[in-house]
Amino acid sequence: MKTLCYIVLFFGATTSLAQQTLEQVLLKYNKQSIPYISAEMLIDIKNDPTIVLLDSREKKEYEVSHIKGALYAGYEDFNLQEVSKNIKSIDTPIIVYCSLGVRSEDIAETLQKAGYTNIKNLYGGIFNWKNNNLPVVNRQQKPTDSVHVYSKKWGKWLTKGIKVNNK
C-alpha cells in the first residue's frame, strides 16, 4: 500500500510540474526586456491611428489569421528597413506580437536597438488574444476562428479557435 501511495505521489508531482502557466513559459523563454501590454489594454487603444501593430510570426501564420490592422513584420525574414517605412518616428507607439510573446520580444529588442523607444509586447500573443474571444482576420480581411499554432508544443496554449498547423 505504501508503494502505491509513493507511485501516485510521484506521478502527481511529475504531472503538475509539466503543467506550466503562461507566465512561467514567458519567464522561461523571454528576458522580460520589453514591457508587456495586455489584450484588454490593446483593445482600448487599437484604433488609435498613431499605433503601429506588428505581427512577428512567419508569413504562413500571418495569412491564416492576424489581428485586424496588424502589419506583417515576420521573424526569420524580418527586415528592419522595410518595417521602419511604416513607423513615423522613434517614439511612435509600437506593439509587437507573435503566437505567445517569445518571437515578438526578439523583434521588439531589434527595434529598440534601432532607436525606437515606445515598444510593447502583447502578453500571450495572438493565442491569448483569441482565447479572450477577440477577433482575428484572414488574408482576405474576413473574420475567422482559425489560428496558426506554429507547432504542436505551442498549440496547446490556444484554447479557443481552430488550430491550424501547415508545416
Q: What is each residue range found by the language model?
A:
Residues 49-51, 91-93:
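A general structural motif
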Residues 37-43:
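N-terminal signal-anchor transmembrane helix
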Residues 42, 50-57, 70:
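Short hydrophobic beta-strand that contains or immediately precedes a catalytic carboxylate
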Residues 97:
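Short, surface-exposed ligand- or partner-binding patches at beta-edge/loop junctions that are enriched
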Residues 19-37, 63-92, 105-167:
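Rhodanese-like catalytic fold shared by cysteine-dependent sulfurtransferases
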Residues 101-102:
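Residue-level detector of alpha-helix initiation sites
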Residues 1-24:
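Bacterial Sec-dependent N-terminal signal peptides
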